[in-house]
Every structure is written in structure tokens, then in C-alpha cells.
A protein has these predicted regions:
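Phosphate-binding loop of NTP-binding sites
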Residues: 104-253, 257-269, 390
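Short glycine-rich anion-binding loops that position phosphate/pyrophosphate groups of nucleotides
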Residues: 57-58, 198-199, 220-223, 255-256, ...
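Short internal beta-strands
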Residues: 69, 73-79, 249-253, 396-399, ...
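Short, flexible loop segments at boundaries between secondary-structure elements
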Residues: 224, 501-520
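Active-site beta-alpha connecting loops in nucleotide-dependent enzymes
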Residues: 56-59, 352, 384-449, 458-459, ...
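Glycine/threonine-rich flexible loop motifs
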Residues: 62-63, 203, 224-231, 406-408, ...
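Acidic, Mg2+-coordinating active-site environments of NTP-dependent enzymes
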Residues: 83-89, 186-187, 202, 212-368, ...
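N-terminal leader/targeting and accessory segments in enzymes
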Residues: 1-108, 284, 314, 318-320, ...
Length: 520
């Protein structure tokens, strides 16, 4: 669904003028008063009335032909493509808008086409190296507890009240972001929570988007690769751009490089700080305690009339690292007008798909934790919090590493996991164009000498082997054995070659296999 229900109609002429005013327009042809009702950049999903963006290094004229056949009324391209695309404009009668940068145009035009849906929907953006998804789900859970509906754009799922699907990249391209916000307005959702990746900030996917609240969780050295960000500086600067058009900035005082983050956040109209054991923060937590697979803490700074002890908050999710995520969600909720009762209820009833999902065997001997952890920071927090919750338990970890990106993980992950693991099983995980066996061998090469490990490529066989080992080899009569299934969470797609192939999720495998006690 592309179409906004409002009275204002955007025309090709309006878009040409907007590009011109912003100094982006180089040339235009066949501009007139035709209505533009949507935006697209993928020739396979074009609706009649769309403006089509010709983007990408490998753009072919055939893509534009498809878009025009599907009813696109105008297209935007850079000068390098004019020679090959101009004949198509002549032939079809579509308007051609030639710009300096298609990326900039993709950030400028959609808000106009969809008639500024951000005026009717409160938008919260969350960035950080780890915790974005959890914080986003926490905030969504709080908003639902307050009786409101809330849209979500994130790495696990995207749901705007009209479209709902499993995501393949954290932040979609600008035209999609704006379509989702427009869908929120159409379906009556008052707010939208967005995970904002550094890639999205770098490539202008949210450049023109005014965040009501922009949250900064943390910064780590994870996404440094030739494909993503060549240097830490590039990555960090990209992340800081979330504050460029924020009304309120929320900053975790526990992040590395906090002074630079606060300096960047000072451009916002209002600054809210959070922190664990940071009494100088606007909202802070003290006395964090683990209660089984839940967490309690005392919250300070939320209510003017609170007692010395603060408000007691219960988080229905394990991992004390989640307290920072909760504080960000609490701060954002307060900024969009949600009270303490809904905050408490939303956090206690929380479920985050694929994050610290606990599956327990009927006889209590095996506890499986399914988690999306797939980088150094998230491995470190996950393993240390499992060890704190179950100090006497043997631990078996099943994981791999994604193909074609972040090479350094193949060294880091086994090193992070080894001190806590009794057995590591390396399995296939989103190999893309690499040989999964090669990836697993590289992981195995970096295991410190004394930690048992094996390679079982097939994920189902690996999970089966982990449960068998948990019952037969790695047993402590006084404590359950913990099996960690890492990286895939509840995802039902595996990235193989150029395809996303359907698979059974780790969560489903855990539920199906945990009570098997007879092994051949």
C-alpha cells in the first residue's frame, strides 16, 4: 500500500521545485501536474503513480523500463545515466529529474510524496552497537501496555499496521521508511519505533527524518569492514548523525567516547541522560539484581515525588546488560508521554523474539538459551550473565560466523566463548558466498588449546549433538547443563549465495529437540 489518504496531492512539478530549491536539480524533462502517490527504487515493486529512483552502481535501463511499464510517472537519476535513460523518458512521456545525488533525492522527496506523515506519528530512533533491538521491543511493549499501538522498523521485524514481514536489513532505504510511517498514520498507529543502523545514517536513509526522540545506547568496534565502514571513525561519525534532527536526545552515560556523544547530542532541543549507577544522570538505575531469569533494579529520576529508594522495576528478561536498554526505553516512553504504570507493566511482561529466549527440558536437566548474539560485545555480555546466573552449570555453545563480512569475528568469538564453555560446536550461519566449512575451520583455528570443539555444519544436527552431549557427557548432578544456540534466534531465513533460504529457526529446533533422551 503506497497511498496516503490525505487531501494534499503531490505533483511531479512540486517535486521538481523542491529539488531545485535544495540545489539538487541539474535538469528536468516533461515536468507537469501529474499526481505522484508513492516512491520506489526496486523495479519489481512499483505501483502506478510512483516516482522511481534509479539507484545503484549496477543500474540498468531495463530496470527503468519495468518501472515505467508498472506505471511510474517520473524518475530520478544522476547525470551519468542520462544518456542511457533519456530515450525511455521520451518514449513513455514520464518526467525525468536529473540530480546531483540520488541518495540525497531519496531523502528529500518521500516526505513530500507521503504528505509529511511524521506530523501525525511520534518517531523514536535507537542506535547503538548492541541492544538496539531489545530496547526497541521494550519500548514497543511499554507503548502497548499504555493501550496504544506502535509501528516498528527493526532488524527482527517490520510492522506498520499494513505491512508486516521479517526484516533482512536493520534500516530500510528512505522511501521505504517514509512509506512505513505513512502506513502507521493510515492504520492509526500513534508512534513508530525504529532501530537505526550506522549504515542507514551514513547513506542518508534517515537524513530528512525528524526524530521526536533519538537514543544512543553504546559504541563498539564491530561493524568495521571494507563493505560497511572502513574505519572506526567513519562508523562513529555515522552513528552520531542520529542527533542531527532530533527534538530530544537520550544518551547512555555508560557508553565509550561519552564526551563526544554528549557534544553531538547538544544540537537537540532537550537532552536526557541515563546510566546504571550514574547518580548524575536524569534517569538512573541502582541495586541491579538477578532473580532467576529476570532482573530487578531501582529506578531514580522518573517521578518528582519518588522516595529515596526509587521505583522498583522488574524486567522479564535475563542479562543485566539489559538494564541500560530498559533505561533507554523508559526515557523514550516518558518523552512521548507514557506514565510509570504502563512502563512497569510493559517491562515485566516483555518478550523479545530471539533474545535470551529460555527453553527448559521437562526434567529440568537441560536449559537452552536461544540468543541473537553474533559479535564480540554481545558474546561477552551473554556468556558472563549466563555464568552469573548458573555458576555451577556446564555450558555448551553452538555458533558460527557470517560469510563475507566482519572477518575479525572468527578470531574474537571463539576467544570470548572459550573461558565460559565446556564444549563449542561450530555450525553454518549465513554463509553468503563463502564456503561454510572454511568459515567454521577458521573459527576452530582460534579456539584456545584446552577447549573441546567440533564442527557440525548442519544446524539441526549441531543442536541435536549439543543436547546429546548435555545429557551424556557434560553433566553436573547439582546443576542443569546450559546449551546456548547463538546468532540466528527465531530467524527462519539463511543467507546462502544471493538467496535467503527458509530454515527451521533455532528457537523451533530447541523446542522440538530439548526433550529427546534416546540417542542412537
Amino acid at each position: 500500500m503506497h497511498h496516503s489518504d490525505s487531501a494534499t496531492v503531490t505533483t511531479v512539478d512540486t517535486l521538481a521545485k523542491l529539488l531545485d530549491v535544495c540545489g539538487e536539480l541539474r535538469a528536468s524533462e516533461q515536468v507537469d501536474e501529474r499526481a505522484v502517490t508513492g516512491c520506489s527504487f526496486d523495479s519489481r515493486v512499483v505501483s502506478a503513480g510512483d516516482v522511481f529512483f534509479c539507484k545503484g552502481a549496477a543500474f540498468k535501463p531495463a530496470f527503468l523500463s519495468m518501472a515505467l511499464d508498472a506505471g511510474a510517472v517520473a524518475f530520478v537519476c544522476e547525470e551519468s545515466l542520462v544518456e542511457s535513460l533519456e530515450p525511455l523518458a521520451q518514449e513513455s512521456g514520464a518526467a525525468m529529474l536529473v540530480v546531483d545525488s540520488v541518495r540525497t533525492a531519496m531523502a528529500l522527496l518521500p516526505p513530500e510524496v507521503y504528505d509529511r506523515p511524521d506530523h501525525d506519528v511520534k518517531i523514536v530512533g535507537i542506535t547503538g552497537t548492541k541492544g538496539k533491538t531489545t530496547a526497541a521491543f521494550m519500548l514497543q511493549s511499554i507503548i502497548k501496555a499504555a493501550g496504544e499501538s506502535c509501528g516498528m522498523i527493526g532488524s527482527v521485524s517490520t510492522d506498520d499496521g499494513i505491512e508486516c514481514y521479517e526484516s533482512t536489513n536493520t534500516t530500510p532505504e528512505a522511501p521505504e521508511v517514509w512509506r512505513h510511517i505513512a502506513n502507521c498514520r493510515t492504520s492509526g498507529r500513534q508512534s513508530m519505533v525504529m532501530e537505526v543502523s550506522s549504515q542507514a545514517l551514513k547513506y542518508q536513509r534517515v537524513e530528512n527524518l525528524p526524530f521526536d526522540v533519538a537514543c544512543f545506547l553504546n559504541i563498539g568496534r564491530d561493524h568495521i569492514s571494507l563493505i560497511e565502514h572502513p574505519t572506526f571513525e567513519d562508523y562513529f561519525e555515522s552513528k552520531l548523525r542520529i542527533f542531527d534532527q532530533a527534538k530530544t536526545a537520550v544518551v547512555n552515560l555508560g557508553t565509550e567516547e561519552v564526551d563526544r556523544v554528549l557534544e553531538a547530542a547538544s544540537t537537540a532541543e532537550r537532552l536526557v541522560t541515563i546510566g546504571v549507577e550514574h547518580p548524575e544522570a536524569s534517569l538512573w538505575a541502582s541495586d541491579v539484581r538477578m532473580v532467576g531469569f529476570s532482573i530487578e533494579f531501582n529506578l531514580h529520576g522518573l517521578c518528582a515525588d519518588e522516595s529515596e529508594a526509587g521505583e522498583k522495576i522488574l524486567l522479564g528478561i535475563a542479562g543485566d546488560f539489559n538494564v541500560e536498554n530498559a533505561l533507554v526505553a523508559i526515557a523514550a516512553a516518558r518523552e512521548i508521554g507514557i506514565g510509570i504504570e504502563a512502563i512497569k507493566k510493559g517491562l515485566s511482561k516483555l518478550r523479545v523474539p530471539g533474545r535470551m529466549e529460555v527453553v527448559e527440558s521437562k526434567d529440568g536437566r537441560v536449559i537452552c538459551v536461544v540468543d541473537y548474539a553474533h559479535n564480540q560485545l554481545s558474546f561477552r555480555s551473554l556468556f558472563s550473565s549466563v555464568k552469573r546466573a548458573f555458576p555451577a552449570s556446564p555450558v555448551i555453545a553452538v555458533f558460527g560466523a557470517a560469510g563475507g563480512k566482519a572477518q575479525e569475528r572468527r578470531e574474537q568469538l571463539p576467544r570470548e566463548a572459550a573461558p565460559y564453555s565446556d564444549l563449542m560446536i561450530f555450525a553454518n550461519e549465513d554463509p553468503a558466498h563463502e564456503d561454510p566449512m572454511k568459515v567454521c575451520r577458521e573459527l576452530a583455528e582460534h579456539v584456545p588449546d584446552d577447549t573441546p570443539n567440533k564442527i557440525i555444519l548442519d544446524r539441526e544436527a549441531a543442536v541435536h549433538a549439543a543436547f546429546k552431549a548435555a545429557r551424556e557427557e557434560y553433566v553436573n548432578p547439582d546443576a542443569p547443563t546450559i546449551v546456548l544456540l547463538l546468532a540466528k534466534g527465531d530467524e527462519e531465513l539463511m543467507h546462502v549465495g544471493d538467496e535467503f533460504v527458509p530454515i527451521e529457526s533455532d528457537l523451533s529446533l530447541a523446542n522440538r529437540l530439548i526433550d529427546v533422551t534416546q540417542f542412537d
